[in-house]
Amino acid sequence: MSDEIVLYRSVASRSVTALWLLEELGVPYRLETRDLKKGETRDPAYLKINPFGKVPTLAIGDQVTFENPAICLLLADRYSYGALAPKLEDPARGPYMTWTVWATSALEPASALEGHDIPPKRPGDWHFGFGKLTPELDALEAALASGGGYLAGGRFTAADVMVGSVVALRLFTGQIPRRPTLAEYVDRLSARSAFKHAADINWPPAEFAHVQPAP
């Protein structure tokens, strides 16, 4: 079985997270681009790979993984165990896994709904399990303050790739407020050469020409 790494991605999408981590790892990989505008993630051949019709999807030989947190956890464990992925016995392992999953289970939905007035189906029936944006960001800032600017073990890990990519995009679109701590976090991460390369590939400026960056 070949262990070739293939990343199925789309331009101007959240595929940048997995691509950034691959660049951090320095492992060889091949990109397979699917055009979202042309519906190429919904064609039958791609749906056999990812039944949700989404990107990114990672294939390592016959092993297929989708959803950014799962991809990040797998890649870091497989290619950077003990470095970008804290070891199982490392106290940082818990925060590392928590923040990696939190990025899409809490931060993404909370920030996507911020500012939208969605009425409950019944009076008193208002509840979202992922929480409200302000306390989520408060917790993130507290973790960064206590962790020396990073989320696990006081050092850069794949958790920062996962969370940092979400924060970077949400700051750009204005879906989260530009708090100084978060802006500094993104500035620090975006200075990394792996981030720059991934962003150049997956977030080309022309694709965002219609988006007015948040002040």
Q: Which residues fall in each region the model found?
A:
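GST-like domain detector, emphasizing the conserved glutathione-binding G-site
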Residues: M1-H127
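Short, solvent-exposed turn/loop segments enriched in Gly/Ser/Thr/Pro and often Arg
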Residues: D35, A158, N202-P205
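Active-site-flanking alpha-helical
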Residues: A76, V166-V167, A199
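Acidic/histidine-enriched, glycine/proline-rich intrinsically disordered or flexible terminal extensions
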Residues: N202-P215
